[in-house]
């Protein structure tokens, strides 16, 4: 060994270092909170507050105006605000909610796991000048998609929409 080289770690030190690194990784992912439990997410799940908090759930609820500059055209929509509220409420009861970490998280949940019956939904074909759907096809949803994003330092419910049967 010369004055510029470092001593090489033995196998036990390498294994110990890898084990410690794995433990840190597990601990950090275990500490991530379920998105649905975060106060700012719960606040943003209120469709009337969502747009002002940076989300776009109103882009997926028939009868509500989407955020400025967006449209419901070519989007899937809940048939009513009540269907949207039910989809969010039922997400509170699933046993495997996504944990918020990084910058965004997404989860698709079947209606069966949400303990919801079949729900009618719309596929928007045309919208007015404000982006509100004016012509649609009706379909039966099979799943609900939940999208969470870190916005201005706070987690929010960014999107929530029905997924059609194939």
Regions found by a protein language model. Give the residues of each.
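Functional cores of ribonucleases/endoribonucleases
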Residues: 34, 45-166
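Sec/Tat signal peptide C-region and signal peptidase I cleavage site
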Residues: 28-32
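N-terminal secretory signal peptides that target proteins for export/translocation
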Residues: 1-10
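Bacterial N-terminal signal peptides
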Residues: 15-26
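Cleaved targeting-peptide boundary
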Residues: 33-39
